[in-house]
């Protein structure tokens, strides 16, 4: 019996004897014969059955030497050491990832490097509010490199954007807004934030932060004392 007849008997359209696999559909058949598991079992089978002449791919190489043009590509791929039962299975293999990958390695091509860096066009410029807070002397022309309000430097626009949207900057901006709003009731040292206490002369009390000072001014006690003064 010829080796090709043996191959046809082992690998049919509905059953793979080497893998003991039932093949119901065309897609299942192609997927099975293309799989690495099948290729490994086929190589093992021919190693254990030398009377069949060994693996078809190896046998064709030995008979034809380095002349790859003499090999029937519909029956065997010498590059991947795989045998096929039909032209459809062979065509599926040659268009698959495994064959393409080995072909690139053979030609010395390197796979493309994946990059996670975002293109410059996708980077958003830092948002600059038009409110008086940001338009204060703390704001500089190079706001994408430095935040005068928080004394923070940036390496790129994306880092600047993240800073301006962060809690620290928003907290400092709100603090400056209160300072500017309360500028008429604070002395120069308090307005510049150089003091740790803020005094209300109307009520004769000292507050530890600008937030407490602002809350005190909105309170009923201060409003009452202000009216009675």
Swiss-Prot record:
Zinc finger feature spans (Matrin-type): 14-44, 72-106, 145-175, 198-228
Compartments where located: Nucleus
Keywords noted in UniProt: DNA-binding, Metal-binding, Nucleus, Repeat, Zinc, Zinc-finger
InterPro entries, sorted: Matrin/U1-C_Znf_C2H2, Matrin/U1-like-C_Znf_C2H2, ZN346_ZMAT4, Znf_C2H2_jaz, Znf_C2H2_sf, Znf_C2H2_type
Gene that this sequence comes from: Zmat4
TM regions (residue ranges): none
Pfam families with a match to the protein in the record: zf-C2H2_jaz, zf-met
One MF term in the entry's GO annotations: zinc ion binding
Organism: Mus musculus
Name recorded for this polypeptide: Zinc finger matrin-type protein 4
Record-linked Gene3D superfamilies: Classic Zinc Finger (3.30.160.60)
GO cellular component: nucleus
UniProt keyword annotation of Nucleus present: yes
Main subcellular location: nucleus
């Amino acid at each position: 019996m010829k080796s090709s007849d043996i191959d046809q008997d082992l690998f049919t359209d509905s059953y793979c004897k080497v893998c003991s696999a039932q093949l119901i559909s065309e897609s299942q058949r192609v997927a099975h014969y293309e799989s690495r598991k099948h290729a490994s079992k086929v190589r093992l089978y021919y190693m254990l059955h030398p009377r069949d002449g060994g693996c078809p791919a190896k046998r064709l190489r030995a008979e034809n030497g380095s002349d790859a043009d003499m090999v029937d590509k519909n029956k065997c791929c010498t590059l991947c050491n795989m045998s096929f039962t039909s032209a459809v299975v062979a065509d599926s293999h040659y268009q698959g990832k495994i064959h393409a990958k080995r072909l690139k390695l053979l030609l010395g091509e390197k796979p493309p490097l994946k990059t996670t860096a975002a293109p410059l066009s996708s980077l958003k410029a830092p948002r600059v509010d038009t409110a008086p807070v940001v338009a204060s002397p703390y704001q500089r022309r190079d706001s994408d490199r430095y935040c005068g309000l928080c004394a923070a430097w940036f390496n790129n626009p994306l880092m600047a954007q993240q800073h301006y949207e962060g809690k620290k900057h928003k907290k400092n901006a709100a603090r400056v807004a209160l300072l500017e709003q309360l500028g008429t009731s604070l002395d120069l040292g308090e307005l510049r934030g150089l003091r740790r206490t803020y005094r209300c002369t109307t009520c004769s009390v000292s507050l530890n932060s600008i937030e407490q000072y602002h809350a005190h001014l909105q309170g009923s006690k201060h409003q009452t004392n202000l009216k009675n003064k």
